[in-house]
Protein backbone atom coordinates (compact mmCIF):
# COMPACT_ATOMS: atom_id res chain seq x y z
CA UNK A 1 0.00 0.00 0.00
CA UNK A 2 2.78 2.45 0.87
CA UNK A 3 4.52 1.88 -2.50
CA UNK A 4 1.26 2.68 -4.29
CA UNK A 5 0.92 5.89 -2.27
CA UNK A 6 4.55 6.78 -3.07
CA UNK A 7 3.95 6.29 -6.82
CA UNK A 8 0.77 8.38 -6.66
CA UNK A 9 2.56 11.25 -4.86
CA UNK A 10 5.48 11.11 -7.29
CA UNK A 11 3.09 11.24 -10.24
CA UNK A 12 1.18 14.17 -8.69
CA UNK A 13 4.42 16.13 -8.16
CA UNK A 14 5.56 15.42 -11.74
CA UNK A 15 2.24 16.53 -13.26
CA UNK A 16 2.01 19.72 -11.17
CA UNK A 17 5.66 20.61 -11.86
CA UNK A 18 5.19 20.03 -15.59
CA UNK A 19 2.06 22.24 -15.64
CA UNK A 20 3.87 25.14 -13.95
CA UNK A 21 6.78 24.91 -16.36
CA UNK A 22 4.49 24.93 -19.39
CA UNK A 23 2.45 27.90 -18.17
CA UNK A 24 5.54 29.91 -17.23
CA UNK A 25 7.18 29.45 -20.64
CA UNK A 26 6.31 32.25 -23.05
CA UNK A 27 6.93 31.52 -26.71
CA UNK A 28 8.21 34.52 -28.68
CA UNK A 29 7.03 35.27 -32.22
CA UNK A 30 9.85 34.47 -34.68
CA UNK A 31 10.85 36.20 -37.91
CA UNK A 32 11.76 34.38 -41.14
CA UNK A 33 15.31 33.92 -39.82
CA UNK A 34 14.12 32.24 -36.63
CA UNK A 35 14.92 35.24 -34.42
CA UNK A 36 12.49 36.65 -31.84
CA UNK A 37 10.50 39.74 -32.84
CA UNK A 38 11.72 42.71 -30.81
CA UNK A 39 9.76 45.68 -29.51
CA UNK A 40 10.35 48.88 -31.47
CA UNK A 41 12.18 47.20 -34.38
CA UNK A 42 10.90 47.53 -37.96
CA UNK A 43 9.48 44.42 -39.66
CA UNK A 44 7.62 43.73 -42.88
CA UNK A 45 4.45 41.66 -42.56
CA UNK A 46 4.44 39.38 -45.59
CA UNK A 47 1.94 36.82 -46.84
CA UNK A 48 3.05 33.20 -46.59
CA UNK A 49 0.95 32.19 -49.60
CA UNK A 50 2.32 33.86 -52.72
CA UNK A 51 0.41 34.96 -55.79
CA UNK A 52 -2.24 37.14 -54.15
CA UNK A 53 -0.35 40.30 -53.33
CA UNK A 54 2.62 41.56 -51.38
CA UNK A 55 3.29 42.94 -47.93
CA UNK A 56 1.00 45.12 -45.84
CA UNK A 57 0.78 48.86 -46.40
CA UNK A 58 -1.66 51.79 -46.11
CA UNK A 59 -4.07 53.32 -48.59
CA UNK A 60 -6.24 56.42 -48.41
CA UNK A 61 -9.61 55.15 -49.62
CA UNK A 62 -11.51 58.36 -48.78
CA UNK A 63 -14.56 56.41 -47.71
CA UNK A 64 -14.34 56.44 -43.93
CA UNK A 65 -14.04 58.72 -40.93
CA UNK A 66 -10.46 57.43 -40.69
CA UNK A 67 -9.27 57.76 -44.29
CA UNK A 68 -6.29 55.41 -44.13
CA UNK A 69 -6.89 51.67 -44.29
CA UNK A 70 -4.49 48.77 -43.85
CA UNK A 71 -4.26 46.86 -47.13
CA UNK A 72 -2.19 44.17 -48.77
CA UNK A 73 -0.10 45.65 -51.59
CA UNK A 74 -1.38 44.46 -54.97
CA UNK A 75 2.18 43.80 -56.21
CA UNK A 76 3.57 40.50 -54.99
CA UNK A 77 7.18 41.75 -55.11
CA UNK A 78 6.37 44.65 -52.77
CA UNK A 79 7.29 44.16 -49.12
CA UNK A 80 4.86 46.90 -48.11
CA UNK A 81 5.66 49.34 -45.31
CA UNK A 82 7.59 48.33 -42.19
CA UNK A 83 5.72 48.14 -38.89
CA UNK A 84 6.76 48.20 -35.25
CA UNK A 85 5.15 46.20 -32.46
CA UNK A 86 4.56 47.51 -28.93
CA UNK A 87 3.33 44.94 -26.40
CA UNK A 88 1.03 46.08 -23.60
CA UNK A 89 3.45 44.71 -20.98
CA UNK A 90 6.48 46.58 -22.43
CA UNK A 91 8.46 43.33 -22.82
CA UNK A 92 11.57 43.34 -25.02
CA UNK A 93 10.35 40.49 -27.24
CA UNK A 94 6.89 39.97 -28.71
CA UNK A 95 5.26 36.88 -27.17
CA UNK A 96 2.72 34.79 -29.08
CA UNK A 97 -0.91 35.67 -28.22
CA UNK A 98 -0.04 38.89 -26.35
CA UNK A 99 -1.84 42.19 -26.90
CA UNK A 100 0.26 44.47 -29.12
CA UNK A 101 -0.12 47.78 -30.88
CA UNK A 102 0.96 47.61 -34.53
CA UNK A 103 2.12 50.83 -36.15
CA UNK A 104 3.39 51.93 -39.55
CA UNK A 105 4.75 55.16 -38.06
CA UNK A 106 4.33 57.03 -34.78
CA UNK A 107 0.98 58.39 -36.00
CA UNK A 108 -0.38 55.35 -37.89
CA UNK A 109 -1.47 52.89 -35.21
CA UNK A 110 -3.69 50.00 -36.33
CA UNK A 111 -7.27 50.12 -35.09
CA UNK A 112 -10.45 48.15 -35.62
CA UNK A 113 -12.62 50.70 -37.44
CA UNK A 114 -16.37 51.07 -36.98
CA UNK A 115 -18.55 48.45 -38.67
CA UNK A 116 -19.06 49.29 -42.36
CA UNK A 117 -22.79 48.91 -43.06
CA UNK A 118 -22.32 48.96 -46.84
CA UNK A 119 -19.92 46.01 -46.99
CA UNK A 120 -20.90 44.42 -43.66
CA UNK A 121 -17.21 44.34 -42.69
CA UNK A 122 -15.02 45.33 -39.77
CA UNK A 123 -11.98 46.92 -41.47
CA UNK A 124 -8.56 47.71 -40.02
CA UNK A 125 -7.62 51.40 -40.18
CA UNK A 126 -4.65 53.42 -38.95
CA UNK A 127 -6.35 55.93 -36.64
CA UNK A 128 -5.49 54.18 -33.38
CA UNK A 129 -3.69 55.41 -30.29
CA UNK A 130 -0.56 53.74 -28.93
CA UNK A 131 -0.41 52.44 -25.38
CA UNK A 132 -2.80 53.20 -22.52
CA UNK A 133 -4.42 49.73 -22.36
CA UNK A 134 -8.05 50.03 -21.36
CA UNK A 135 -11.61 50.78 -22.43
CA UNK A 136 -10.79 53.81 -24.60
CA UNK A 137 -8.06 52.03 -26.57
CA UNK A 138 -9.42 48.47 -26.70
CA UNK A 139 -9.84 48.68 -30.51
CA UNK A 140 -6.09 49.32 -30.94
CA UNK A 141 -4.83 45.96 -29.64
CA UNK A 142 -4.13 42.88 -31.76
CA UNK A 143 -2.46 39.52 -31.18
CA UNK A 144 -0.05 37.44 -33.23
CA UNK A 145 -1.08 33.79 -32.92
CA UNK A 146 0.47 30.60 -34.23
CA UNK A 147 -1.34 29.30 -37.31
CA UNK A 148 -0.19 25.90 -38.47
CA UNK A 149 3.59 26.44 -38.83
CA UNK A 150 3.25 30.17 -39.41
CA UNK A 151 1.32 33.08 -37.87
CA UNK A 152 -1.91 35.01 -38.16
CA UNK A 153 -3.02 38.33 -36.73
CA UNK A 154 -6.07 38.21 -34.51
CA UNK A 155 -8.29 40.83 -32.96
CA UNK A 156 -9.22 39.63 -29.48
CA UNK A 157 -7.93 42.21 -26.98
CA UNK A 158 -7.67 41.36 -23.30
CA UNK A 159 -6.42 44.77 -22.11
CA UNK A 160 -9.84 45.63 -20.67
CA UNK A 161 -11.33 43.10 -18.25
CA UNK A 162 -14.89 44.42 -18.44
CA UNK A 163 -15.04 45.35 -22.15
CA UNK A 164 -17.12 43.24 -24.51
CA UNK A 165 -15.03 42.58 -27.62
CA UNK A 166 -15.27 40.67 -30.89
CA UNK A 167 -12.72 37.88 -31.28
CA UNK A 168 -11.89 37.12 -34.91
CA UNK A 169 -8.94 36.60 -37.20
CA UNK A 170 -7.67 39.29 -39.54
CA UNK A 171 -8.02 38.36 -43.21
CA UNK A 172 -8.47 40.06 -46.57
CA UNK A 173 -11.63 41.55 -48.09
CA UNK A 174 -11.35 42.64 -51.74
CA UNK A 175 -13.15 45.92 -52.44
CA UNK A 176 -12.75 47.87 -55.70
CA UNK A 177 -9.52 46.02 -56.45
CA UNK A 178 -8.00 46.79 -53.02
CA UNK A 179 -7.11 43.91 -50.67
CA UNK A 180 -8.29 45.48 -47.40
CA UNK A 181 -7.56 43.93 -44.02
CA UNK A 182 -10.76 43.06 -42.20
CA UNK A 183 -12.02 40.66 -39.56
CA UNK A 184 -12.57 37.30 -41.21
CA UNK A 185 -13.19 33.60 -40.71
CA UNK A 186 -10.29 32.99 -43.12
CA UNK A 187 -7.07 34.38 -41.63
CA UNK A 188 -4.26 35.84 -43.70
CA UNK A 189 -1.28 33.59 -42.99
CA UNK A 190 1.73 35.86 -42.40
CA UNK A 191 5.46 35.87 -41.72
CA UNK A 192 7.74 38.64 -40.48
CA UNK A 193 10.92 39.92 -42.12
CA UNK A 194 13.19 42.35 -40.30
CA UNK A 195 13.63 45.65 -42.17
CA UNK A 196 17.24 46.86 -42.14
Curated annotation (Swiss-Prot):
Main subcellular localisation: endoplasmic reticulum
Family indicated by similarity: Belongs to the protease inhibitor I3 (leguminous Kunitz-type inhibitor) family.
Family matches, as CDD domains: beta-trefoil_STI_VvMLP-like (cd23375)
Keywords recorded for this protein, A-Z: Disulfide bond, Endoplasmic reticulum, Plant defense, Protease inhibitor, Serine protease inhibitor, Signal, Thiol protease inhibitor
GO cellular-component term (any): apoplast
GO annotation, biological process: defense response; negative regulation of peptidase activity; response to insect
Signal sequence region: 1-19
Function: Can inhibit both serine proteases and cysteine proteases. May be involved in the modulation of the proteases that participate in the hydrolysis of dietary proteins in the gut of spider mites.
Induction details: Induced by infestation with spider mites.
Organism: Arabidopsis thaliana
SUPFAM superfamilies per record: STI-like
Cystine residue pairs: 156-167
UniProt cross-references to InterPro entries, sorted A to Z: Kunitz_inhibitor_STI-like_sf (IPR011065), Prot_inh_Kunz-lg (IPR002160)
Ranges in a coiled coil: none
Name by which UniProt lists this protein: Kunitz trypsin inhibitor 5
